Amino acid sequence: MTERVDPKKLIKGGLHDWEVVIGMEIHAQVTSRSKLFSGASTAFGGEPNDHVSLVDAAMPGMLPVINEECIAQAVRTGLGLKAQINLRSVFDRKNYFYPDLPQGYQISQYKDPIVGEGEVLVDLPDGESITVGIERLHLEQDAGKSLHDQDPTKSFVDLNRSGVALMEIVSRPDLRSSEEAKAYVTKLRTILRYLGTCDGDMEKGSLRADVNVSVRRPGEPLGTRCEIKNVNSIRFIGQAIETEARRQIAILEDGGKIDQETRLFDPGKGETRSMRSKEEAHDYRYFPDPDLLPLEFDQAYVDGLASGLPELPDAKKARFIKDFGLSAYDAGVLVAERASADYFEAVARGRDGKAAANWVINELFGRLNKEGRSIEDTPVSAEQLGTIVDLIGEGVISGKIAKDLFEIVWSEGGDPRAIVESRGMKQVTDTGAIEAAVDAIIAANPDKVEQAKAKPTLLGWFVGQTMKATGGKANPAAVNALLKDKLGIE
């Protein structure tokens, strides 16, 4: 099968066009109260070494005990990724020395992971969609944290994070641009949050990305890849890929060769730096952990977890398009966060879905973004916004008045219907009152009347003047109809 090559995704070098090939390894911290093999807390923060059990500290004679909730969360995630769930998997020891790895090895999964192949459908900013293959998902322990800035001559180790369960989600090298990579991580984070298996908080390190980047001439075999470790924001993922691809292209066009290595991205300097030569699997001397039996469960266990899964973003998006008549773009915006989708659904229930979506996306999200607030922190409840949509639909207020009403509810709260009554915000629907205002505007502007007959677009000016004269309360449809009639405009 010929691989797709999108000319828009190619990077122009000094001599040739180049294709960047990207694979991702996402480390997602499992949402659970205790660690993968101990009962110590997974709470973020706290004093250094506050949440450390004897198992986490690798004290002699301490044996790991599997946390079943972490297993269930991994299976839920696999199901959410439409992946093969392996009924038998094995924990292995990954051997390497690092100061914040007290055992001298990490308990991970190598040959027999808990989750096999799956896929993620990713919507791109340009409206296209791609399918990214998932190679595997395995469980492993997180390491501790080395602190080098506490003392000029010493380094310290905080083991609070040591032993926390991670899901490493490995994609196939199916991504062909930094935009695709960012969209993939965004979609994966959305799925994890819907499932409740990882909070996706990159600032706290709950989601970290290792990015594998190589470049090649279109149609040629894969190039030598470099791995950029621990990129901790979606924006930085994009920057790291662009920077590393340019570095590799410059070397190749200069006649050099790419060394397979692990690199770090420095966002301050906008460059990647060599960290160490890239290890191969045999360097870690994997072997099954003798302290842990193979992990086995039956299909009934998987089916039980599957039955409890929530509606996921793709299914919710399809339903919003079908049930509420939304565009694919609007539905995509609304399902990007589960809380946003739930809010919209509460507003749209029993109402015009398109009108509800318009108010949620344009007015509410616009205001939240302006103030840097999240949907969970909105001062306008779904019930209040739904009432505003009702008042427009009932003809009680116009769209312009509705925006003023939204501002009042945002700032002061209260029942929108009661506010309209108490502040006299109802739109004028009395044709006689509107006609009087229209007649006054026409009488005061005879020159504009003549111009409007020759240039019908001037109707908008008359509408604006009439709305101004009525304090924005006149029914816009009635104003338009009267003006067209009196000015003789079709």
UniProtKB/Swiss-Prot annotation:
**Which SMART domains does this UniProt record tie to the protein?**
GatB_Yqey
Q: What is known about its subunit structure?
A: Heterotrimer of A, B and C subunits.
- Molecular function terms, GO-annotated: asparaginyl-tRNA synthase (glutamine-hydrolyzing) activity; ATP binding; glutaminyl-tRNA synthase (glutamine-hydrolyzing) activity
Quick check: keyword Signal in the entry?
Answer: no
Catalytic function, reaction form: L-glutamyl-tRNA(Gln) + L-glutamine + ATP + H2O = L-glutaminyl-tRNA(Gln) + L-glutamate + ADP + phosphate + H(+); L-aspartyl-tRNA(Asn) + L-glutamine + ATP + H2O = L-asparaginyl-tRNA(Asn) + L-glutamate + ADP + phosphate + 2 H(+)
Q: Which GO terms describe its biological process?
A: glutaminyl-tRNAGln biosynthesis via transamidation; translation
Gene3D superfamilies recorded = 1.10.10.410, GatB domain, N-terminal subdomain
Q: Which function does this protein serve? A: Allows the formation of correctly charged Asn-tRNA(Asn) or Gln-tRNA(Gln) through the transamidation of misacylated Asp-tRNA(Asn) or Glu-tRNA(Gln) in organisms which lack either or both of asparaginyl-tRNA or glutaminyl-tRNA synthetases. The reaction takes place in the presence of glutamine and ATP through an activated phospho-Asp-tRNA(Asn) or phospho-Glu-tRNA(Gln).
Which cysteines pair up through disulfides? They are none
Keywords recorded for this protein, A-Z: ATP-binding, Ligase, Nucleotide-binding, Protein biosynthesis
Q: If you read the UniProt record, what top EC class would you report for this enzyme, in one word?
A: ligase
One Pfam annotation, family name? GatB_Yqey
| This enzyme's EC code(s) | 6.3.5.-
Name the gene for this chain.
Answer: gatB
> Is Membrane set as a keyword in this record?
no
Q: In which family does this protein belong, per the annotation?
A: Belongs to the GatB/GatE family. GatB subfamily.
UniProt xrefs under PROSITE patterns: GATB
Protein name, UniProt field = Aspartyl/glutamyl-tRNA(Asn/Gln) amidotransferase subunit B
